[in-house]
């Protein structure tokens, strides 16, 4: 049972920096997701976000990103989707350490938003997948919550703007991906507007391009394929 759990579910290690010891780095290796507990401190997390010029940094975001590395091995590498992955995200056999060093030295390309969900996603195909995976989890979680509260949105329809109930992405049968896309933009606009009404920053400070949506669709299709097998 333990081996089966390790195959399909990641393990977690919440560690803290110790005086004189090595720095604890958030990451994934060998099925274990390591998180530095300093990321749970609001002030420290904000400091790191500003230092790295990130628009969004949360503990939940870290968990979702690192789980993407875990599930890439199981759903893409072991799931027979490597060729399709490489056609869309690039070749993950590129030198990972060199790619990250180049990213931190030079930054993302100026047109990064055309094909990526975030600037960090440009660093390497593995990071592109993990960032896209995290955004997909953000999307389905927020849509599911909105659906549970019977939220209705005004969305474009065949005869103009129509009122539409938010779909539950975990319903059976699952709603089409295009439905999730159609509802995502107005839902995040609503969410951000509610935050601004209370003097808070945008909860979802991203604008996704058609290229980024193609990658999100790949994640969705990968999850649906695994769920039905």
Spans of features found by a protein language model:
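Catalytic glutamate of the conserved HExxH
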Residues: 62-74
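Pan-zinc metallopeptidase signature
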Residues: 121-229
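Post-HExxH zinc-binding segment in Zn-dependent metallohydrolases
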Residues: 72-143
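Glycine- and acidic
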Residues: 48-54, 115, 172-177
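Auxiliary, metal-adjacent structural segments of Zn-dependent hydrolase domains
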Residues: 1-42
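Active-site-adjacent bridging/hinge elements
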Residues: 35-46, 98-111, 162-166
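Short pre-active-site segment immediately N-terminal to the catalytic Zn-binding motif
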Residues: 43-63
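Active-site-proximal structural scaffolding
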Residues: 28, 56, 60-64, 123-126, ...
